[in-house]
Amino acid sequence: MKRIFVFFLLSLTLLMTTFPSKSLSAETIKWYPYEEGMTLGKSQHKKIFINFFAEWCGYCTKMDKGTFVDPEIVSYLNKNFIAIKVNADKENTLSTRYKVRGLPSNWFVSDSGDQIGNFPGYIPADNLLPILKYIQTDSYKQMAFKDFMNVK
């Protein structure tokens, strides 16, 4: 019996070291509920990124498993924005306020709560990073996004 227990422990240890959990070692986006995130945005003077999603939405899941785990996206969002995740099916009032017509819907809001703009639909990580920089640097106040991309 003792040998079986030792064998089990060794096997478990080997299994845990062979397949480390990503969630234990990787940084993740700090998502806030809507009201808390809006309050934090104002108090920390940070712009707000709002991701409207639904559990049935395939592209929302694709963003969760791809875009929102990309280390550059995670780092940039956590450092420069307050990130809010809103389930569009459960938060009808917010979905109406932001005129969400399709999912995913990605909104940017100023620290004072003014809507800056919406980038609807699935956005891969390599496309989202320049959008984040465009909004965070206030370049949206001086130029169109396509012009921002040409200047970079």
Regions found by a protein language model. Give the residues of each.
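Positively charged n-region of N-terminal signal peptides that target proteins for export
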Residues: 1-4
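Bacterial N-terminal signal peptides
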Residues: 7-17
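Sec/Tat signal peptide C-region and signal peptidase I cleavage site
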Residues: 19-26
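Thiol-based oxidoreductase modules, predominantly thioredoxin-like and allied folds used
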Residues: 28-32, 68-92
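A short beta-strand-turn-helix
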Residues: 30-46, 77
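Structural micro-motif
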Residues: 47, 98-109
